[in-house]
């Protein structure tokens, strides 16, 4: 019998992953690519988890399913549970309270840490897949209580990235997306040269982190 990994990642329902997202998953660094990790991670599809229930309209039904899956994973020996989408910050408090294992639903949980290291005179830039869906509630549930030095930048208006929403099963240029990621943050840095760190909300963006570090000289979380 194959031994269950100690870390599990909750990902979208297998029937709800578009061709564009599948292409992003081929990149090392993407949260759902097994090659992103130097150790075994259980990648677990969760029924009902999709663009709507995770990003746009979080709901009790998905929370209930998350809790059920987390408890099942814990019974199999999993000790830490994360997810494949930063918008799952919405479920952080409830999930952490419902299961005894360590739960870290979102990269947004790193924002308070980033705020600390840039100091009171620096700013933290959050780069999100879609700022229209990233609410104050998401930030609050990620324990981002101080918004004074937090800036939010979005990919949703970038021509290539917008295909995630407008043409999810059509062609998708990964090189163009990389350029868009750097471009959005470069513009942000020009407007706010005191930006000292970047946090990617979206777990499809880490494959492009090295470009940001190399070209803009910023740490990326």
Regions found by a protein language model. Name each.
Residues 94-118, 213-221:
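Short, acidic/small-residue loops that bind anionic groups at enzyme active sites
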């Amino acid at each position: 019998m194959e031994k269950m990994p100690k870390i599990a990642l909750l990902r979208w329902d297998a029937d709800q992953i578009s061709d564009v997202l599948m292409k992003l998953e081929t990149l090392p660094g993407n949260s759902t690519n097994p090659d992103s990790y130097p150790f075994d991670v259980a990648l677990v599809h969760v029924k009902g988890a999709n663009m709507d229930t995770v990003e746009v309209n979080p709901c009790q039904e998905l929370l209930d399913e998350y809790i059920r899956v987390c408890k099942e994973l814990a019974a199999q020996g999993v000790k830490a549970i994360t997810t494949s989408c930063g918008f799952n910050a919405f479920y952080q408090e409830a999930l952490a309270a419902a299961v005894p294992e360590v739960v870290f639903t979102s990269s947004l949980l790193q924002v308070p840490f980033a705020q600390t290291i840039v100091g009171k005179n620096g700013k933290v830039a959050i780069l999100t897949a879609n700022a229209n869906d990233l609410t104050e509630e998401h930030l609050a549930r990620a324990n981002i209580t101080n918004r004074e030095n937090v800036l939010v930048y979005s990919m949703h208006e970038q021509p290539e990235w917008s295909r995630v929403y407008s043409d999810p099963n059509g062609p998708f240029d990964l090189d163009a997306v990389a350029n868009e990621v750097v471009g959005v943050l470069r513009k942000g840095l020009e407007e706010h040269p005191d930006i000292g760190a970047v946090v990617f909300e979206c777990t499809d963006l880490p494959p492009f982190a090295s470009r940001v570090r190399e070209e803009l000289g910023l740490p990326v979380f």
